[in-house]
Amino acid sequence: MSLLSIRDLDIALPEGADRAYAAKDISFDLAAGEILCIVGESGSGKSMSANAVMGLLPQEVKPVRGAITFDGQNILALSEAQMLELRGRRISMIFQEPLSALNPLMRVGAQIAEVFEAHGQLRPQQRHSRALTLLEEVGIPDPESAIRAYPFQLSGGQRQRVMIAMALALEPDILIADEPTTALDVTTQAQILDLIEDLRRSRGMAVIFITHDFGVVADIADRVIVMQTGEIVETGAADEVLLRPRHPYTRALIAAIPRLTLQADAPAGDRVPVLSVEGLNKTFVTGGGGLFGKPRVVRAVRDVSFDLHAGETIGIVGESGSGKSTVGRCLTRLIDPDGGRVMIGGADIALMSGAELRDKRRQLQMIFQDPFSSLNPRARVSRILTEGLIAYGTGRAQAMERARELLGLVGLDPSAMHRFPHEFSGGQRQRIGIARALALEPSIIIADEAVSALDVSIQAQVLDLLAELKARLNLSMLFITHDLRVAARICDRIIVMQKGAIVEVGPTGKVLHDPDTAYTRSLLDAIPGQEYERALAAGGDF
């Protein structure tokens, strides 16, 4: 007997949307203890279908037909009070963007404790103890410090782990995981996948796992659903769908998966450094709240040095909290380093101010990790893409034309110009962020997890686009990523960071296939779907 049954579900979009339905004719069952993966491009209806199960659809989006049956009840017919009782306790969800889902004004421990309080479970001291245990289970380093921290004080991967801890707090019957490992490094991702597998086995918990990572699908899925523009186009056992796909769309998605065996070409042209980093250091002081709080010193970046050459792409990889993103922010002067030099064109940007720094920032643009927090929620896409151009002297009409061109380059329709960031899926918002970074035609791009929120087909398009721009404009890129397959596809060299320091650097093929350090080997061993990749290459089973 099915634990959850969805039949003939139609979810209507508001008038004026690019299509009539977010999801159309959706039908599937979920059994106790089963892991069902839903894959598809951004905007395919994956998240909308999951939100309908939770009763969390946007106000303007309505289920207009069908039924969602759980424990003998049609969820679509329940009152809000009944849904509040159901959410968290029986069905729980891990959201895609933790920074927007977590309360920025509450400490992590209070947010986890709030889950128990809302359902009348545990005494206050027990809630604190259970919160610590949950943070340990999801791999948060130093849970005692993390429980007192605010979300902004944690890395992107650590914030996602907090969200997972909250979702698992009440040990639900069904866990809906919407891209839960997108922001996680490979070792933490492996820990979370193992944790979800353990809970499935020990408690019979069922999981709906929404992802664009086919390696993850191969490692955990019992069954797979493939969605395209709101409809299910293929469903079946994981090995059947992944190795013997029937639908052309599924075959196209699988063909776009980056492989460790696909290496970037060696950079051509001169070897002139366009960016030189020498002895970069950055320390943060966290904690110390209240009269007796003890501050904690974190050396986020320790003596980092490297050169980035014209036309070269360097990948920076490592676990969450290794200092990857902090390096990127120091280079752009979004935060100031404590020591070291950052040389662009022979000039140290640490000594620049005013017009000189402004001019250098035009040459060096950043693509951020979390598009929801880096895009102005009150600005239409047209303003987001044109304000930088206009600030540097481009006429409004020319800037608007450039914005339309940029949207096409990143795979979005020009009609997106008139919409706000909240009207897009997570992957679509990331594409807008990439378009904004490309607007001023910089010579250096710092991409902080720039494709982590994208499905494989759009990811492949964006990587191809960046490679094309690199060749055409002699563009140099610093590519911060936790996805070693993406690094294999686009990077000429790889820097491996651990606890703020560089532990290995070398050509991509050397680092990925003959690493010098045990730490790099541990990252490689944790990559999901390696057996699947070998099976694809050999044409066999996994």
Positions of predicted regions on the chain:
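Conserved ABC ATPase "signature" region
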Residues: 73, 126-145, 348, 397-415, ...
